[in-house]
Amino acid sequence: MKKLLATLALGLGMVFASGVALAEDAPAKPAAAAEAPAAAAPADAAAAPAPVPNKGDTAWMTVATVLVILMTIPGLALFYGGLVRSKNMLSVLMQVFVVAAMIYVLWTLYGYSVAFTAGNPFFGTMDKLMLKGVTPESIAATFSKGVVIPELIFVAFQATFAAITCGLIVGSFAERMKFSAVLLFCALWFTFSYLPIAHMVWYWDGPDAITDAASLEKVTAAAGWLWAKGALDFAGGTVVHINAAVGGLIGAYMIGKRIGYGKESMAPHSLTLTMVGAALLWVGWFGFNAGSNLEANGVAALAFVNTLVATAMATLAWI
């Protein structure tokens, strides 16, 4: 009996000792478990969801696009049409109207691809010829990290810029070029002047592509030539206004004066229509300038107020 009790006591002691040993080893397991989330963290970060367009930004860019369309048709057409002689009124209206329609088509065919794809510092590629790969799900970068808009609305917004830029040139040689010559000139100028300038000034991969110094260097190297040099054209001062001004100046110089200039009356057809066109241009410019921010935030509001006040002050100074 004593041997049996001694054996049981020894067995219980060994079980107790092993239990204590297991209890002492147990805290090591949570430590290992605690390491698991840390190891999984990079995987979670890599699996972060892609940015999704905000409905408010998308709605604002849609409205801004419509406003810029109104600048060209009918704003610019009426502005120029009212300034020319009565016999050329319909001609100028049709020139602006058809030039805009033609540029929208050319932009869709190859313009967007040449201006907004990675190629070299001066031209893009034909990777998005006829909007290849541009779908309702594809996105375009803005100026803020994590903020994107649908690429389709970006395509449309930029198309309106191209159209009004070519339309602006029409006024430089109004009444002095045949309709077919105007269309040919605008098609060639759009291809060999507007598109490379747009690529050089505006093309880059967006802020989401920049994560460190190395990626910044890579984005800069792939950007357009003037963008890489630090140029910031917020709303087309270079791509639209300077570009169109140079094209119009050279065109007017090459064609020369109107026949009868300084010898016969060249009274404008209707200053009323010119006033209506100017008013539509002012209204459309809110979409042109504020929409160039590509998102609805305080910077867009600042551009909106600047457009309102600056134009009002210019009007008073002109009066």
Annotated model-derived regions:
Residues 3-8, 13, 22-319:
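Hydrophobic alpha-helical transmembrane bundles of multi-pass membrane proteins
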